[in-house]
A protein has these predicted regions:
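The serine-hydrolase catalytic nucleophile loop
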Residues: 93-105, 119, 311
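Alpha/beta-hydrolase active-site loop
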Residues: 132-153
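Catalytic histidine-centered segment of alpha/beta-hydrolase-like enzymes
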Residues: 331-342
Length: 359
């Protein structure tokens, strides 16, 4: 009898121990990653004035890769009931204190709950090393913002949209292709970052020879980075400005390198991306399934924007009668960063309201 009891105890102990080992084994954890406690600036440090028509607070959420993202949330004052919501990000290399925050605040004034978030590895968000770009992780960032908004008690989860500016305009559309929870998408003054990375501006470097030369240079830089134990930075917007700089480079300088848009956490304002961040963008192509995007899209560009061809070519890939292309008379690429006389904010709000109607 004693031997039988001992055997039962041994079996029970082994089962409990096995369960304990499974529970403590990090390779078997299936729950969401914990939200990292980020050091968030509490004072108003945006490049635009604070509105008295909305409430503002900092929020954090985690993406599917376990990276904690930081965002500014803007809510209409005296909001009642469940409201439609919009996640905003961009431009590429910028932070939420710049253009994306301005858009988010403006749309909150028009009745939406909005968040402007810093992408992974950028600004106040988590992720190491800093200033790394990834077409996969960055599209995931937008979907993670939708995750977060979907479970807020004040948000109508059937009425969530996204808005991307500059390089994040292309990322917004790419995310919407894969995430049907996004009912409406606006891409403002958009870039296709995969196209410009692989082909250069205006497709002037679109050849196997030039891409292979770029790959060889970047691969060599990887070796140097690993040897040095740190990543070489690409540099932000050029400064001082060469006298023969193209007009669009002058426009970037006028935004990122002056009090108008400079922010110390913005890579475009300071020392830029890691040089090798361009590699995954060269090896990836957005919009392969653009024709399958059923939900609504608005692409808007300035008439004079150097980036206009990205938006017009992407628009041709979209199908359905819920897609819109809006060209803003007389506007440049950077006018749609912060020039409220040029940005058709009411048209954008009307688009979201029309394409995300209350049920």
């Amino acid at each position: 009898m004693k031997k039988m009891k001992k055997a039962v105890y041994l079996i029970l102990f082994s089962v409990l121990t096995a369960n304990s080992q499974v529970m403590e084994n990090p390779n078997t954890i299936m729950s969401l990653a914990p939200v990292e406690q980020l050091a968030l600036t509490q004072e108003w440090d945006k490049v635009f004035p604070k509105s008295d028509k909305v409430d503002h607070r900092k929020v954090t959420f985690v993406n599917r890769y376990g990276i904690t993202l930081a965002a500014d949330m803007y809510t209409p004052k005296d909001a009642a009931g469940k409201l439609p919501a919009i996640a905003v990000s961009g431009p590429f290399g910028a932070v939420k204190e710049q253009s994306s925050g301005l858009y988010a605040q403006q749309l909150a004034e028009r009745g939406f709950i909005t968040i402007a978030f810093d992408p992974s590895f950028t600004g106040e968000s988590g992720g190491r090393p800093r200033r790394v770009a990834s077409p996969d992780i960055n599209t995931e960032d937008f979907s993670a913002a939708v995750d977060f908004l979907s479970v807020l008690p004040d948000v109508d989860s059937s009425r969530i949209g996204v808005l991307g500016i500059c390089g994040w305009g292309g990322i917004a559309i790419q995310t919407a292709i894969n995430d049907p929870r996004i009912k409406a998408t606006v891409a403002s003054t958009m870039y296709d970052m995969t196209r410009v990375a692989a082909n250069g501006y205006f497709d002037t470097d679109n050849s196997a020879e030039k891409r292979n030369a770029a790959r060889a240079s970047l691969a060599a830089q990887r070796t140097e980075d690993y040897r040095n134990g740190s990543y070489k930075r690409a540099g932000g917007v050029v400064d001082p400005l060469p006298t023969d700089a193209p007009q669009f480079v002058k426009d970037y300088h006028a935004y990122y390198k002056t009090p108008r848009g400079y922010h110390p956490r913005s890579g475009n304002s300071t020392d830029g991306w890691n040089v090798t961040s361009i590699l995954p963008l060269m090896n990836f192509r957005f919009f392969e399934y653009a024709g399958e995007l059923e939900n609504a899209v608005m692409i808007l560009h300035g008439e004079k924007a150097h980036s206009r061809y990205f938006g017009e070519d992407t628009f041709k890939l979209l199908c359905g009668d819920n897609k819109e292309l809006l060209i803003v008379d007389g506007a440049s690429h950077c006018d749609l960063y912060d020039n409220l006389d040029k940005i058709p904010m009411d048209r954008i709000a009307q688009f979201f309201s029309k394409r995300m109607p209350a049920e």
